[in-house]
UniProtKB/Swiss-Prot annotation:
CDD domains found in the cross-reference section: DEXDc_SecA, SF2_C_secA
Biased composition annotated in UniProt, kind: Low complexity: 557-571
Protein name, as recorded: Protein translocase subunit SecA
Organism from which the protein derives: Synechococcus sp. (strain WH7803)
NCBIfam families per the UniProt record, alphabetical: secA (TIGR00963)
GO biological-process terms attached to the record: intracellular protein transmembrane transport; protein import; protein targeting; protein transport by the Sec complex
PANTHER family per UniProt: CHLOROPLAST PROTEIN-TRANSPORTING ATPASE, SECA INNER MEMBRANE COMPONENT OF SEC PROTEIN SECRETION SYSTEM
Enzyme class at the top of the EC tree: translocase
Keyword Mitochondrion applies: no
Disordered: region residues: 537-571
Binding locations of ATP: Q90, G108, E109, G110, K111, T112, D509
EC number: 7.4.2.8
Length: 955
C-alpha cells in the first residue's frame, strides 16, 4: 500500500542521481580535449581544494561538490587507459558507493570499473581508501587492471598479498588506494594490535572502504571470527582414542523425542550441526576408554568424543575438506575454494586429522580475535557492491546501517529461467542433468553446471565421460584450481561444458565465443614458460597443448581420447578434452613468438624468472598503460597480434553461440541461501546476452531433507511416479522457497547472536587496543603509569578504610604494609603519619608519596642509561596488557559457553554475559594497573657490564 502511495523508494533514489549524471555528461565535453598532463593536473587541483577544508567531516561536503568533476575525469582516464567508458548506470553505481551504501549490480555490469569512481574521489583526501575483494587473485587483478586508471591520474596504488613482509605491507597501506582481501585486512589489524613496537604497525587510520562481493564477506563469512592463535600442548592420544570410540559407536536412525533417548549410541542434529550421546552411548564410551566419568574435570573426555562424532558424521571428506599433502584443508562452503592455513577451532580440526589418520597438529589458544562485522564497522564510511543483495537487505540495514540500492542494468536482460525439475531420487536427478547437458551441448551452446561439492562434481564428470561428452572440471582439487582462469576463459565457447563447484566470487566473466584476450595471454605464457622460468620452480604448463584434431575449427573436439577403462575413459582424461586455442597461429606469428622468446631471454635472462614474475610481466603487457620498457612493449605487440588472429575465429563463434541461445546454466541443488542460487543464474545472460538457466533437484537433497520437514516427506510418499519422471508442483516449489527462507532466517539469527555477543567483546577490545596504541606511540608514558599508581593507592584506601567507622578504628597499619608491598621505596612510611587524616586526605597524601617515590625510582634507572625508564614503562604495560587480555579472552569464551544454560533459570543469557563480562573486564584492567606499578618499582636493571636481566614480577 505504501509503495502505491509513495512510489518505489529505489526508483525515487535513482531519480535523485539523474541530474548529477547529466552534469557529468556535460563535463565530458570539457574534459575530453584535455591533454594527459592537464588531466593529471586536475587531481592536484582537487587535492588542493580538499586540503583547504581541514578535518574529514569538513571535507565531506567538498567531496560531494567535487563528485561530478572527479567522476568526469575518471571516466576520461578509463577511456584513455583501459579503452572502457563508464556507462551512465555505472556512474549511478559510483554515487551509491560514495554515499556509503550497497549497490546491487547484476553480473557482467562492470562492478570492478564502478569501484574506480568512489575510490578515486575518496582517495583525494590523502587518508587512504581500501578496495576489498574475496581472494588474492582478484585483489592482484584489480590492482593491476583498474590501478592503471588511478596511476594515470597521479595517485599511488598499493596491493596486499598473503606472503608480503611487514615493510612491504606498510608501504602498500601508505598508498592512496590499497587493494586487499578481507582476511589480510583483518589479520593485519589484529597483528598491529599485538605489535611490540610502533614501527611494526603497518596500517594507518581507516577512512573509506569499498567491498566487492559484499554479501559474501559481510554475510556468508560473518559467522566465522578472525583468530590469531598461539599453540598449546594437548595430549594427541586422546584425539586418536576418541576417533576409535566414535567409529565403534552407532548413530541413531532418528532424533529422540520428549526427553526419551532413541535407539542407538548417539543422535545427530544436522540442522544445529551437533552430536549428543545417549545414556547407552555414555556407558559404552566410558567402558571403552576405561574411565568412570567422561566429564571428570581432572581427566575430561566428553569434548574429545563430541568432536570425534562431529568429524565422523558432520564433516565429510571432499565436501567440507579435502586431504592434500597429508593435511586436512578446509573447503569454503560458499565459493568451493580451498582455504590453506585456516583451521577449525576447539579441537575440531584435530578430531578430523585423527579420523583421517593424519599427523595431528597442536591445538591453539586465542591471542586476538575479531568478527568481520565489527572489523568493517571500524570504517567511518563503508560501501559495497554485489549482484545479489536485495534478499539480505534487512540484515545489511540492521547490522551495518547500510542501505541497498538496485542499480539498473545497461541493457535489457534476455535470460530465460526455466522451471525447476524435481526428481524422486538423487540418481535420477544426476541422469537428467547429464541428459540435458548432452542435449544443449549438441546444439552447440556452452553449458555451465554448478555443483555443491567436489564429490558431486566428480560424479557428474564420470557420467559425462560415459556419454563421451568433452568437459572441463573446476573444483577445489589443486590440479583444477591451477587451470581456473584458463577453464573460465573458454567456458563460453561453442559446445563447451564446464562443471564448477560454487561459482560465487570466481571473478571472471564467461564471454560467449571465448575470451580471446585471455587465450592470447595464455598462449604467450605457454611459449615463454620453458625459456624464461627457472627449472626448479617445478612448473608444468597449466594449459593442455594444442590438439591435432581441433585445429582451425574453433569449438571443442567432438571425440574423446582413445578408450581406457569401462566407461571409455577416466574422468581425469575427460576434463582436458578440447583445444584451448580457437585456431592454429600462422607460421609468421609462430616465428615472431620464437624471436620474441630469444629477445626476452637477452633482456630478462635464460630461465631466470619465477612463474609469478613471468605472469606479472604478461599482465603488465596486457594493460594499456604507457610503458618505457622495450621488452614489455614487444610483449604487448605480440599479445595484440595473437589476439587479432584468435578474434577472427572467436567473433564468428560468438555469433553462432548467440544464435544457438547463449550460455545455459544448470544448478544441481538449491543452496541454503537464495542468493547463491541467484549468483549462479547470473552467470548466464550477462549484459543483455541470450541465455537460460534451470535447477534440477531431488527429494533427497540436503535442503529438503533437513529443513523441508514432514510436508516434503509426505509428498515423497504421495508421488507414486516413476523415478526418472520430473515432478513439477506449485506446492513443492513453495515448500522449497519456504525451506530456503527458513534457513536464511535461521542463519541470520545465528549471525545476529554472534554479533550481539561480539559487541560486548568489541567495546572491551576497543578500550584495550586504544590504551595499547597510546603506549606504543609513547605518548605521556610516565603520566600514564603514575595514573595507574594513583588509582592503585585509592583502591588500597577503599579496601582498608570503612568511612562509616570513626577514624581511630581504621586499620591504618595494614593499609601501610599493603602500600609498601607495591612501593618498596616507601619503607620509611609510618602508620602515625596517617593518623587524623580524612579518607580524601589519606588518598591525596598517598598519591603524593607515590609520585615522590616514582621520581626517585626514575632517577635511579635513568642513571644507568638515559631513556631506560620510558622503555621499561612501555615493556611492562604491553606485557601486562597482552598477558591479561589473552587470559581474559579465554575466560570470556568459557563464560559464553556456560551462560547459555541460564536461560533455563528464566534469565536472559545475553544480559548475564554483558554484566559478568563487564565485571571481568574491570577486574582485568585493575590487575593490569596493579601489576604494572608493582613491576615498575621492582625493576632492577642489570649494571652496564650486565649479566642478568631485570626482575619482571607480577603481583
Amino acid at each position: 500500500m505504501l509503495k502505491l502511495l509513495l512510489g518505489d523508494p529505489n526508483a525515487r533514489k535513482l531519480k535523485r542521481y539523474q541530474p548529477i549524471v547529466s552534469d557529468i555528461n556535460l563535463l565530458e565535453e570539457e574534459v575530453s580535449p584535455l591533454s594527459d598532463d592537464d588531466l593529471r593536473r586536475r587531481t592536484a587541483e582537487f587535492r588542493q581544494r580538499l586540503d583547504n577544508a581541514g578535518s574529514l567531516d569538513q571535507q565531506r561536503p567538498v567531496l560531494d561538490e567535487l563528485l561530478p568533476e572527479a567522476f568526469a575525469v575518471v571516466r576520461e582516464a578509463g577511456k584513455r587507459v583501459l579503452g572502457m567508458r563508464h556507462f551512465d548506470v555505472q556512474l549511478i553505481g559510483g554515487m551509491v558507493l560514495h554515499e556509503g551504501q550497497i549497490a546491487e549490480m547484476k553480473t557482467g555490469e562492470g562492478k570492478t570499473l564502478v569501484a574506480t569512481l568512489p575510490s578515486f574521489l575518496n582517495a583525494l583526501t590523502g587518508r587512504g581508501v581500501h578496495v576489498v575483494t574475496v581472494n588474492d587473485y582478484l585483489a592482484r587483478r584489480d590492482a593491476e587492471w583498474m590501478g592503471q586508471v588511478h596511476r594515470f591520474l597521479g595517485l599511488s596504488v598499493g596491493l596486499i598479498q598473503q606472503d608480503m613482509t611487514p615493510a612491504e605491507r606498510r608501504r602498500n597501506y601508505g598508498c592512496d588506494i590499497t587493494y586487499a582481501t578481507n582476511s589480510e585486512l583483518g589479520f593485519d589489524y589484529l597483528r598491529d594490535n599485538m605489535a611490540a613496537d610502533i614501527n611494526e604497525v603497518v596500517q594507518r587510520e581507516f577512512q573509506y572502504c569499498v567491498i566487492d562481493e559484499v554479501d559474501s564477506i559481510l554475510i556468508d563469512e560473518a559467522r566465522t571470527p578472525l583468530i590469531i592463535s598461539g599453540q598449546v600442548e594437548r595430549p594427541q592420544e586422546k584425539y586418536q582414542k576418541a576417533a576409535e570410540v566414535a567409529a565403534a559407536l552407532t548413530r541413531a536412525a532418528e532424533m529422540g523425542k520428549d526427553g526419551i533417548d532413541p535407539e542407538g549410541d548417539y543422535e545427530v542434529d544436522e540442522k544445529q550441526r551437533s552430536c549428543t550421546l545417549t545414556d547407552e552411548g555414555f556407558a559404552k564410551a566410558e567402558q571403552m576408554i576405561g574411565v568412570a566419568d567422561l566429564y571428570d574435570p581432572q581427566d575430561p573426555w566428553a569434548h574429545y568424543i563430541t568432536n570425534a562424532l562431529k568429524a565422523k558424521d558432520l564433516f565429510t571428506r571432499d565436501v567440507n575438506y579435502i586431504v592434500r599433502d597429508g593435511e586436512a584443508v578446509i573447503v569454503d562452503e560458499f565459493t568451493g575454494r580451498v582455504m590453506p592455513g585456516r583451521r577449525w577451532s576447539d579441537g575440531q580440526h584435530q578430531a578430523i586429522e585423527a579420523k583421517e589418520a593424519l599427523a595431528i597438529q597442536p591445538e591453539t589458544q586465542t591471542l586476538a580475535s575479531i568478527t568481520y562485522q565489527n572489523f568493517f564497522l571500524l570504517y567511518p564510511r563503508l560501501a559495497g557492491m554485489t549482484g545479489t543483495a536485495k534478499t539480505e537487505e534487512t540484515e545489511f540495514e540492521k547490522t551495518y546501517k547500510l542501505e541497498t540500492t538496485i542499480v539498473p542494468t545497461n541493457r535489457v536482460r534476455a535470460r530465460q529461467d526455466w522451471v525447476d525439475q524435481v526428481y524422486k531420487t538423487e540418481e535420477a536427478k544426476w541422469r537428467a542433468v547429464a541428459k540435458e547437458t548432452a542435449e544443449v551441448h549438441q546444439q552447440g551452446r556452452p553449458v555451465l553446471v554448478g555443483t555443491t561439492s567436489v564429490e558431486k562434481s566428480e560424479l557428474l564428470s564420470a557420467l559425462l565421460a560415459e556419454e563421451d561428452i568433452p568437459h572441463n572440471l573446476l573444483n577445489a582439487k589443486p590440479e583444477n584450481v591451477e587451470r581456473e582462469a584458463e577453464i573460465v576463459a573458454q567456458a563460453g565457447r561453442s559446445g563447451a561444458v564446464t562443471i564448477a563447484t560454487n561459482m560465487a566470487g570466481r571473478g571472471t566473466d564467461i564471454i560467449l565465443g571465448g575470451n580471446s584476450d585471455y587465450m592470447a595471454r595464455l598462449k604467450l605464457r605457454e611459449v615463454l614458460l620453458s625459456r624464461l622460468v627457472r627449472p626448479e620452480e617445478g612448473h608444468r604448463p597449466p594449459v593442455p597443448l594444442q590438439r591435432s584434431g581441433a585445429e582451425g575449427g574453433g569449438g571443442f573436439a567432438a571425440k574423446a581420447a582413445p578408450a581406457s577403462g569401462p566407461h571409455g575413459h577416466a574422468p581425469s582424461e575427460a576434463r582436458a578434452i578440447g583445444s584451448l586455442y580457437p585456431c592454429q597461429l600462422t607460421e609468421d606469428t609462430d616465428q615472431a613468438l620464437a624471436d620474441l622468446a630469444k629477445d626476452l631471454v637477452k633482456a630478462w635472462g635464460d630461465r631466470a624468472l619465477t612463474v609469478i614474475e613471468l605472469e606479472d610481466h604478461i599482465a603488465t603487457a596486457a594493460e594499456k598503460a604507457p610503458t618505457d620498457d622495450p621488452a614489455i612493449a614487444a610483449l604487448r605487440a605480440a599479445i595484440a597480434r595473437v589476439k587479432g588472429e584468435y578474434d577472427d575465429v572467436v567473433k564468428q563463434e560468438e555469433q553462432r553461440v548467440r544464435e544457438a541461445g547463449g550460455l545455459h546454466v544448470i544448478g544441481t541443488e538449491r543452496h541454503e541461501s537464495r542468493r547463491v542460487d541467484n549468483q549462479l543464474r547470473g552467470r548466464a545472460g550477462r549484459q543483455g546476452d541470450p541465455g537460460s538457466t534451470r535447477f534440477f533437484l531431488s527429494l533427497g537433497d540436503n535442503l529438503l531433507r533437513i529443513f523441508g520437514g514432514d510436508r516434503v516427506a509426505g509428498l515423497m510418499n504421495a508421488f507414486r511416479v516413476e523415478e526418472d519422471m520430473p515432478i513439477e508442483s506449485g506446492m513443492l516449489t513453495r515448500s522449497l522457497e519456504g525451506a530456503q527462507k527458513k534457513v536464511e532466517t535461521y542463519y541470520y539469527d545465528i549471525r545476529k547472536q554472534v554479533f550481539e555477543y561480539d559487541e560486548v567483546m568489541n567495546n572491551q577490545r576497543k578500550a584495550v587496543y586504544s590504551e595499547r596504541r597510546r603506549v606504543l606511540e609513547g605518548r605521556e608514558l610516565k603520566k600514564q603509569v603514575v595514573g595507574y599508581g594513583e588509582r592503585t593507592m585509592n583502591e588500597i584506601v577503599e579496601a582498608y578504610v570503612n568511612p562509616d567507622l570513626p577514624p581511630e578504628e581504621w586499620d591504618v597499619t595494614q593499609l601501610v604494609s599493603k602500600v609498601q608491598e607495591f612501593v618498596y621505596l616507601l619503607d620509611d612510611l609510618q602508620a602515625d603519619q596517617l593518623q587524623g587524616l580524612s579518607m580524601d586526605e589519606l588518598k591525596a597524601f598517598l598519591q603524593e608519596q607515590l609520585r615522590n617515590a616514582y621520581d626517585l625510582k626514575e632517577g635511579q634507572i635513568e642513571d644507568q642509561r638515559p631513556g631506560l625508564m620510558r622503555e621499561a614503562e612501555r615493556f611492562f604495560i604491553l606485557q601486562q596488557i597482552d598477558t591479561l587480555w589473552r587470559e581474559h579472552l579465554q575466560s570470556m569464551d568459557a563464560l559464553r559457553e556456560s551462560v547459555g544454560l541460564r536461560g533455563y533459570g528464566q534469565k536472559d543469557p545475553l544480559i548475564e554475559y554483558k554484566n559478568e563480562g563487564y565485571d571481568m573486564f574491570l577486574d582485568m584492567m585493575t590487575n593490569m594497573r596493579r601489576n604494572v606499578i608493582y613491576s615498575m618499582f621492582m625493576f632492577q636493571p642489570a649494571p652496564p657490564a650486565g649479566q642478568s636481566a631485570g626482575q619482571r614480577t607480577t603481583a
